[in-house]
């Protein structure tokens, strides 16, 4: 994942993280903030790599949906 996308998702996680499930939030924090690999996250949560990939994908989609509907990050960045 590119650094730009990582920073963007980390910002969305900071704003909308409480709206995710506890598991999705923890997986995203591990992936984005702690820079753990998908394998490491799977081992820590006792799930398969595919389950981690699915959780990341669903969480990314939810975070983007919240931003599309609410637009807090755009407002914080001074965009319209």
What are these regions (language model features)?
Residues 1-7, 11:
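Acidic, proline/glycine-rich intrinsically disordered inter-domain spacer in sigma factors
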Residues 11-20:
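Short amphipathic alpha-helical boundary/capping segments
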Residues 22-34:
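Short amphipathic alpha helix immediately N-terminal
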Residues 27, 40-42, 52:
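Hydrophobic positions on the alpha-helical face of helix-turn-helix-like DNA-binding modules
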Residues 55-58:
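Residues within the DNA-recognition helix of helix-turn-helix
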Residues 60-67:
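C-terminal flanking helix
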Residues 69-80:
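Intrinsically disordered, low-complexity basic tails/linkers immediately adjacent to helix-turn-helix/homeobox/MYB/SANT
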């Amino acid at each position: 994942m590119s650094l730009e996308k990582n920073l963007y998702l980390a910002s969305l996680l900071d704003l909308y993280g409480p709206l995710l499930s506890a598991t999705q939030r923890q997986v995203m924090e591990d992936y984005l903030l702690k820079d753990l690999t998908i394998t490491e996250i799977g081992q820590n949560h006792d799930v398969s790599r595919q389950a981690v990939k699915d959780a990341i994908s669903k969480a990314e989609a939810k975070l983007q949906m919240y931003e599309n509907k609410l637009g807090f990050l755009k407002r914080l960045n001074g965009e319209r």
